[in-house]
Amino acid sequence: MQPGAALQAMLLAVLLAKPRDSKGRLLSASDLDPRGGQLVCRGGTRRPCYKVIYFHDAFQRLNFEEAKETCMEDGGQLVSIETEDEQRLIEKFIENLLASDGDFWIGLKRLEEKQSNNTACQDLYAWTDGSTSQFRNWYVDEPSCGSEVCVVMYHQPSAPPGIGGSYMFQWNDDRCNMKNNFICKYHDDKPSTTPSIWPGGEATEPATPLLPEETQKEDTKETFKERREAALNLAYILIPSIPLFLLLVVTSAVCWVWICRRKREQTDPSTKEQHTIWPTPRQENSPNLDVYNVIRKQSEADLAEPRPDLKNISFRVCSGEAMPDDMSCDYENIAVNPSESGFVTLASMESGFVTNDIYEFSPDRMGRSKESGWVENEIYY
């Protein structure tokens, strides 16, 4: 028996003899960090060793290239399953996890450069760690050799059996960008650490971080980059809205000023505009005075006594029968006593003008003036 086969058989016997609730289980979601794992080696130091990485949260799972790089950074490779015994050993590792649905990446991938019309699909696949083993555990009608290049080991406990039987632990080609769990394998060049003893004499190494410090720094950088991109996206939304906000502020201010001015104009009296358009004539400067009111204001002395410095102008209507259009009467400027004349003209030095608006007609003239004549009266300054 080869040494590798003996190691695998011994590990398998230890796993089968160990109770499931013992402290020697491979991985525990409560004990291990989701991005950590535990090496399982024969005797604690003999190679190869394995580390099964399972994520309860599907969002934390990795695609094929990410899983491959993670194993390499930890000093290993994606697992290459070279014999049927090793396949059963990996199955026991996964069963010991009591894990729910979630496939596992293995280190088998199709090589596009080997693809030709004469090459069978299954012959295009090779192990990424350089192993030349031809052992395969494909499900029925797999691989499909379409756009699915990378290979997973089925782990769907809740899935019903298909046409080829149970899917559990069978191989299937899948798209490399899918998110899955993965298994790392560590060969003889992996340095050993102080192991912990399992029941039955076997030992395992303590849980070690799956990702080194450099990978954690990269995760921090990625988180910072995502936050910065989110801040930039928010800035791209807010900056174009600033001119619109300023326009709204200016428009609101202009409307508010206009409304205030309109209210102020409505509350002011409108007499100023009316005076400007239709000025009220001042009575002291108007030539159309009410002579009757002026006469009432004059004293009886002005009405009774003539004054030597005033010139009385009297008018007399023609006594003829001519029509008003042909009227050519004589008029006389006679200074007579108001009591002797047939009509009276008044003059006032205080008022600055002469008015003659009171006419006393004799009875015989009164009748004739009504029938054939009319009288003109004017104001002389």
Swiss-Prot record:
Stretches the record annotates as 2 X 4 AA repeats of N-X-I-Y: 356-380
Organism: Mus musculus (Mouse)
Protein name, per record: Layilin
Signal sequence extent: 1-24
Record carries keyword Phosphoprotein: yes
PANTHER family per the UniProt record, alphabetical: CHONDROLECTIN, CHONDROLECTIN VARIANT CHODLFDELTAE
Annotated disulfide bonds: 71-184, 150-176
SUPFAM superfamilies: C-type lectin-like
Primary localization class, coarse: membrane
Glycosylation sites: 117
Segments for region (3 X 5 AA repeats of E-S-G-X-V): 340-375
Localization in the cell: Membrane
Region ranges (Interaction with TLN1): 337-381
